[in-house]
């Protein structure tokens, strides 16, 4: 057809590399990048999938809700611990081409710990957070992605990496709305 003749491009599939179908200009750009860059597979990094809560509406909260939880803390010590527990979070859709647009969302990081290194979060030490999560009890009690208790997030072997710098990809492909948060 005329369209194929006008738009067709040659792709060499004889090598052992993955198939990449690009226009001639895109192939040229790819070759230039590969000539000066280090392939991601050769970097000394680990790639993870992010946080799975099993119930985002309970564990991912707005700034307003965070402030409400902090205001409900009974002591200054509880407030300080709670501030450290509730961490800012970026979702895949918050990542833009050259930066990010933070949606002012926070993760209640009631993690399950890392055996032998980091203890599990005991919800009893965070009464204001527990009161918030209790509002979602029917949803959090039976979720598959949970830790030792329904209040804990699932086991995460790379918990220590959450406070390190990251490379974040903006397109997360998932059919499950409770997954895919970097």
Which residues are covered by each model-predicted region?
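Polybasic, glycine- and aromatic-enriched phosphate-binding surface used to engage nucleic acids
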Residues: 2-182
